[in-house]
């Protein structure tokens, strides 16, 4: 049996983790296997995101440079800091 009372557990809520990633590069995976990379500028409670210097990726390679984009939160599969 593990005694968890002596262990520190660092648990973050999803929006807290996003807040920690503001003004940092992130990779966003969307439904339909689309992937974007850019600097996270803002987000809201629905996890809608604004990325600056956004690029669309395919197999890890840049296919398009998009500039500033808004990504709807419903389409996001994961966000990687």
Curated annotation (Swiss-Prot):
SUPFAM superfamilies: Sm-like ribonucleoproteins (SSF50182)
GO biological process: mRNA splicing, via spliceosome
Pfam families for the chain: LSM (PF01423)
Key word Ribonucleoprotein present: yes
A molecular function GO annotation: RNA binding
InterPro entries: Lsm6/sSmF, LSM_dom_sf, Sm, Sm_dom_euk/arc, snRNP_Sm-like_arc
Gene3D superfamilies to which the protein is assigned, alphabetical: 2.30.30.100
KW Kinase (keyword) present: no
Gene Ontology CC: one annotated term: Sm-like protein family complex
Sm domain boundaries: 13-81
Family statement: Belongs to the snRNP Sm proteins family.
Protein name per its UniProtKB record: Putative snRNP Sm-like protein
Organism: Methanothermobacter thermautotrophicus (strain ATCC 29096 / DSM 1053 / JCM 10044 / NBRC 100330 / Delta H) (Methanobacterium thermoautotrophicum)
